[in-house]
């Protein structure tokens, strides 16, 4: 993309290399590990976004994330609630596609939108026709000012706020992060990431494949780093650089700071953190987008 495209839209394009000037050389090494040895742009991006949010503060949003738009579907959402329909990922993506067709002034019921049939949406043919009719009604008087702005984001000074969805209890995403500059929580997350990469190096799992010797510890789950994208088990990246890493650090802080008894299971605390009053979970986003649907880490 040419610089002019960014300039006319008020974007400032910056080189990521300057992010590594003020931190340990380890992070540029980890970045190149992911790019060169694994071709893993997801982990490389995870590292960069944490460095950005730590050094600059503010709000980070993935390019394939859209604003929260489900509020525009008054009629269809009421119908879904009355009929007890469970919205699958396909259903939510379908609603997003319809919305995108509307704002681009394209034919609503094009082949691109009807790519998923009623079976994928969890309804029969009659129910599908009714849903299409209700969506058309909801979008008939749509205007861009109906999309809720992000508004002010309140984040505790040394914590961070993280993307989440109300329908997934205790689940978080790093597509949407907000933090003050030099947040202590982000610093601890980066330090923990460094410890995990060093564990991989110590066990010779960066340049060689892991051979299971039956000994296990808390970080043994990371040792298949080299083969993760080959076997497609996708269990390393989230806890090495992604949302799993962030949530595990937050849970550890919760246990320590509030002296929570170890009998309280982590998933209970993770669900509790989704309470809007705590300012940790961010819900004003939509990850059910055409580009987001292709993410390896959601499969």
Predicted regions and their residues:
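Glycosyltransferase-associated regions of secretory-pathway enzymes
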Residues: 1-46, 59-299
């Amino acid at each position: 993309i040419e610089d002019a495209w960014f300039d006319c839209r008020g974007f400032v394009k910056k080189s990521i290399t300057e992010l590594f000037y003020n931190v340990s050389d380890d992070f540029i090494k980890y970045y190149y590990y992911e790019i060169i040895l694994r071709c893993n742009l997801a982990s490389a991006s995870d590292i960069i976004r944490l460095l950005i949010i730590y050094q600059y503060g503010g709000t980070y949003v993935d390019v394939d994330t859209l604003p929260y738009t489900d509020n525009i579907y008054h009629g269809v959402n009421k119908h879904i609630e009355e009929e007890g329909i469970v919205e699958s990922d396909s259903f939510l993506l379908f609603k997003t596609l319809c919305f995108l067709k509307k704002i681009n002034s394209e034919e609503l019921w094009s082949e691109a939108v009807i790519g998923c049939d009623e079976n994928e949406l969890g309804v029969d043919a009659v129910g599908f026709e009714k849903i299409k009719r209700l969506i058309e009604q909801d979008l008939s008087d749509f205007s861009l000012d109906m999309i809720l702005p992000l508004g002010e984001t309140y984040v505790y000074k040394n914590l961070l706020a993280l993307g989440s969805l109300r329908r997934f209890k205790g689940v978080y995403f790093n597509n949407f992060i907000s933090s003050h500059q030099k947040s202590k929580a982000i610093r601890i997350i980066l330090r923990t990431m460094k410890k995990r990469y060093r564990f991989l190096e110590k066990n010779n799992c960066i340049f060689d494949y892991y051979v299971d010797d039956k000994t296990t510890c808390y970080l043994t789950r990371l040792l298949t780093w080299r083969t993760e994208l080959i076997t497609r088990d996708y269990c390393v990246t989230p806890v090495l650089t992604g949302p799993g890493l962030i949530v595990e650090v937050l849970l550890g802080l919760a246990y320590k700071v509030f002296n929570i008894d170890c009998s309280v299971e982590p998933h209970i605390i993770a669900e509790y953190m989704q309470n809007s009053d705590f300012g940790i979970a961010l819900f004003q986003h939509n990850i059910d987008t055409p580009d987001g649907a292709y993410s390896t880490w959601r499969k």
